[in-house]
Amino acid sequence: MNETLVDRNNITLRDRVKSMAASFGLPRLIIAGFLLLLFIAAPFVGADFWTQISNTINRFSWNAIMVLAMVPMIHSGCGLNFGLPLGIISGLLGATLSIEFGFTGPLSFLMAILIATPFAVILGTLYGWLLNKIKGGEMMIATYVGFSSVSFMCMMWLLLPYHSPTMVWGFAGKGLRTTISLEGFYDKVLAGFLQINIGNLSIPTGTLLFFAVLAFGMWAFLHTKTGTAMTAVGSNPTFARAAGVNVDKMRMLSVILSTWLAAIGILVYEQGFGFIQLYMAPFYMALPAVSAILIGGATVNKATIANVIIGTFLFQGIVTMTPTVMNNMIHMDMSEVIRVVASQGMILYALTRKTEATK
């Protein structure tokens, strides 16, 4: 009888472990295990453990909002937002115009957000209108919308009448530079706010709090009447339409919200790195964000805030740690090559995997 009880307990424990593994997702367990292995190996190959933790947290804080921008369109049934560069361009316009108008310090960051917002709303409305016309092929069209908008802006960055000596080419006095320093403007405006420094460990508290506010806002919005209607449109548009929900309006709202979050996301990304990059820089920025949320357990039909947090941390952790550890192990300067292999490999995995959504 005792043996029977032990067997039952063992089965219960085994089932519990299997249930937890299924809930978290086997692919995520493997990636998390590999990331943990990299963290453990770091001190043994000469990489400072706390510095690597800091780098991972910093990269998470810079990229999390752009991954969060995926959530509204997934909920409304528009799929993954491969047109993220539209929102990024809105943010870049806000950033450059804020500097052009002479704003400095934290005020330049606030003004960049305010200026970027109408651009995001206008571009998001046009983008949403287009996606409503081609239902079923949103992700393919979104990809080309993103690529073409970046190429178009390559011309506009040269032609738009900017005059700030901080941004324009020195020899011509017109056309924006490829890279613009944010020193004296909003460099580290969030990362330096309430920053915690303990030895080599540095935690960008301000950036994490800013993301937390936006993430909570998104969670709260999805639980409102409008957010519930948006989710219903994504789950079953026919039922939503029968219930009196304007399907096209909900889809357009999700696109506008996603575009606005992308604009905010690139501004946070810039303040972390300390500079603005124009021209072809936004070209492939949608892919890491798409991959991160998929690795986090989302699908093209379902996504949660937990998917955003877990996916961003895993993706950025692997991209940060793999080059550092491998470079120290083989004692060759191949960090950039390894970084590209790791990041593109993660993107390839995320875009080709077929699994059910996890919590």
At which residue positions do the language-model features occur?
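Single transmembrane alpha-helix segments in multi-pass membrane proteins
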Residues: 51-103, 125, 129-136, 293-302, ...
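Helix-loop-helix "hairpin" substructures at the membrane interface of multi-pass membrane proteins
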Residues: 200-277
